[in-house]
Amino acid sequence: MIQMQSILQVADNTGARSLMCIKVLGGSKRRYAGIGDIIKVSVKDVAPRGRVKKGEVYNAVVVRTSKGVRRADGSLIKFDGNAAVLLNAKLEPIGTRIFGPVTRELRTARFMKIVSLAPEVL
């Protein structure tokens, strides 16, 4: 469950290391974001020679949460931390590699690129 001011790790090779959620997109009163939801983020920490700069604002899709996601068969998939993948204005991933596992819930037409780049799909 991601809300405003939540700190997330970055699961791609854009050069950003940590992000802060500044808005949950999808309705004016929407408070929380889960896996597969789009959020507005600010870059808080960057690696040298990265593609993004500190302080820049991007869209991002949440790919892992500590809260996890409940499946229809009753299973619950949780992760050690919260992670997101940076997106451009057209909601396409900026990076060319994805690090760590992602869940099957991302297998929509919008995020098939992320699923295909991921090393493991749970």
UniProtKB/Swiss-Prot annotation:
- Please provide one cellular component term from the Gene Ontology annotations of this protein: cytosolic large ribosomal subunit
Q: Which GO terms describe its molecular function?
A: large ribosomal subunit rRNA binding; structural constituent of ribosome
Is the Ribonucleoprotein keyword given for this protein? Answer: yes
The organism's superkingdom is given as Bacteria
A GO BP term here is: translation
Keywords in alphabetical order, please.
Ribonucleoprotein, Ribosomal protein, RNA-binding, rRNA-binding
- Which Pfam families does UniProt cross-reference here? Ribosomal_L14 (PF00238)
User: What does the sequence similarity comment in the record state about its family?
Assistant: Belongs to the universal ribosomal protein uL14 family.
Instruction: Indicate the quaternary assembly.
Output: Part of the 50S ribosomal subunit. Forms a cluster with proteins L3 and L19. In the 70S ribosome, L14 and L19 interact and together make contacts with the 16S rRNA in bridges B5 and B8.
This chain's function reads:
Binds to 23S rRNA. Forms part of two intersubunit bridges in the 70S ribosome.
Name of the protein this chain belongs to: Large ribosomal subunit protein uL14
Lineage in the entry? Bacteria, Pseudomonadati, Pseudomonadota, Betaproteobacteria, Nitrosomonadales
